[in-house]
């Protein structure tokens, strides 16, 4: 960043109306600049003498005029978020007072902070690792408590520690291997195949566990797009209203009431579902309703875009050709068959065996009476993998981390295969070096400037 070593300021709270607005100041001259625009209520106090982890009440000055009441929180380097001197100034919420405070600080010598610049300085000053820095935005953007807990575990350094253990084991192995290859005269004991392959296999398994949990972790943090599909009048809108907790969609006995997509975000257990209630899917002839036909085309498009499909069937009626077409289109997708209107169903109306080849889960329900809701909640969590995920455990929290972990895992797999296929230790050592490089990229120890810029370009100003 252009002014990494200047003193910067930015609004740290959301802009607009609110109880308070907080402006963060960080840098070598933070106390000097704030001292120019902050007048303590107790005049014998001064900003320059303020100790870390203390607060002071005063008013901020703009062009020499007292403006709003202001509370200053002081942090001394290196015991601050950025590792620098930091002061956080809180005034009444709203744009006027916050903008005035920013103007006063910039006039006094502050530079406006860029996106993520405070966290970038924390990284540069050793206050956090790159994986922790990435977790900052994940905590902010997390949907639901478990998603926030998952992101918080990375922010607390659990991911960095877990990767560190893998690195240490591989570095120890690599050092032994290097010594044996490069210094044969030193009588370094040769690694046995069992010890070499065993260590690689153990660390590959650790990476496999991290990689396999990524998708479920992403669901907990960000939610998943979920489409409700089914032929007309099977109860899709009733199910939407049940999940939403209020009448979001119009429900009538008339088939085809929903003609366009209805969107609603809901929390189902630990998972946030971005629901899309769609027009009933059925075969429409060439001379059919053009509006309905367009709604059906949009429904099928949503099927291709969704991360979860709830295919709704009328359990009180035999499966129609339209039902079977829907089932076929759901095959191979993360799809759950919801057998709705179970209260009206006979024993043989919808044979489960007909649907089982196409769906991961089948859930009987009566959406009108909220019967089967817990079973649906459990099925969604199990299908998406969130039921097996420990939100307190270390997890990968970005696509960049996933790519690096995958490269490391694949390199270890190649090293194992090299030994099993009779190649020498020197060939396996090349793969081991590649794995270590990928792990260094993951943690940021050897990350390029381009990688770091990529991480911080997604940050908001003030963080």
Model region roles, listed by residue range:
Residues 91, 251-252, 296, 313, ...:
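Hydrophobic alpha-helical scaffolding
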Residues 1-149, 153, 336:
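A glycine-rich (often HGG/GG-containing) alpha/beta subdomain
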Residues 56-67, 72-76, 256-287, 305:
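Switch I (G2) and immediately adjacent beta-strands of P-loop GTPase domains
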Residues 26, 91-93, 243, 278, ...:
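Glycine-rich, N-terminal phosphate-binding loop of Rossmann-like dinucleotide-binding domains
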Residues 2-15, 145-267, 273, 286-287, ...:
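C-terminal-of-GTPase-core extension/linker across diverse P-loop GTPases
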Residues 275, 310-312, 338:
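Structural motif
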Residues 17-20, 28, 84, 94-95, ...:
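Gly/Ser/Thr-rich helix-start
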Residues 292-316:
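Inter-motif core of Ras-like GTPase G domains
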């Amino acid at each position: 960043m252009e002014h990494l070593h200047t003193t910067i300021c930015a609004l740290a709270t959301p802009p607009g109306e609110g109880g308070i607005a907080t402006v963060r100041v960080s840098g070598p001259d933070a106390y000097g600049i704030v001292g120019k625009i902050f007048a303590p209520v107790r005049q014998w106090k001064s900003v320059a003498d303020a100790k870390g982890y203390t607060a002071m009440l005063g008013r901020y000055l703009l062009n020499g005029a007292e403006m709003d009441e202001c509370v200053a929180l002081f942090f001394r380097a290196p015991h601050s978020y950025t590792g620098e001197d930091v002061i956080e100034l809180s005034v009444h919420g709203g744009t006027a007072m916050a903008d005035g405070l920013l103007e006063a600080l910039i006039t006094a010598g502050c530079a406006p902070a860029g996106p993520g610049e405070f966290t970038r300085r924390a990284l540069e000053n050793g206050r956090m690792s790159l994986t922790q820095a990435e977790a900052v935005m994940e905590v902010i953007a997390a949907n639901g408590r478990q998603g926030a807990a998952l992101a918080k575990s990375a922010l607390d350094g659990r991911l960095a520690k877990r990767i560190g253990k893998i690195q240490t084991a591989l570095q120890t192995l690599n050092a032994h291997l290097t010594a044996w290859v490069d210094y044969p005269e030193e009588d370094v004991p040769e690694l046995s195949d069992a010890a070499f392959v065993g260590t690689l296999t153990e660390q590959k398994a650790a990476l496999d566990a991290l990689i396999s949990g990524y998708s479920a972790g992403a669901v907990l943090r960000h939610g998943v797009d979920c489409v409700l599909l089914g032929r007309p009048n099977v109860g899709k809108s009733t199910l939407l209203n049940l999940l939403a907790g209020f009448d979001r969609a119009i429900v009538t006995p008339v088939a085809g009431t929903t003609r366009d997509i209805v969107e609603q975000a809901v929390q189902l257990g630990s998972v946030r579902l971005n629901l899309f209630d769609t027009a009933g899917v059925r075969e429409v002839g060439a001379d059919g309703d053009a509006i309905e036909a367009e709604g059906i085309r949009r429904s099928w498009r949503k099927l291709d875009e969704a991360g979860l499909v709830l295919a709704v069937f009328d359990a009180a009626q035999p499966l129609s050709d339209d039902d079977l077409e829907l089932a076929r289109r759901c095959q191979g997708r993360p799809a759950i068959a919801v057998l709705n209107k179970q209260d009206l169903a006979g024993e043989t109306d919808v044979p489960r065996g007909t649907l089982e080849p196409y769906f991961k889960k089948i859930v009987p329900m009566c959406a009108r009476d909220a019967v089967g809701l817990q079973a649906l909640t459990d099925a969604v969590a199990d299908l998406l993998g969130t039921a097996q995920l420990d939100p307190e455990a270390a997890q990968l929290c970005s696509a960049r981390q996933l790519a690096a972990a995958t490269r490391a895992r694949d390199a270890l797999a190649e090293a194992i295969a090299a030994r099993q296929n009779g190649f020498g230790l020197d060939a396996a050592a090349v793969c081991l070096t590649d794995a270590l490089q990928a792990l260094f990229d993951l943690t940021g120890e050897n990350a390029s400037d381009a990688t770091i810029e990529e991480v911080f370009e997604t940050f908001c100003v003030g963080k």
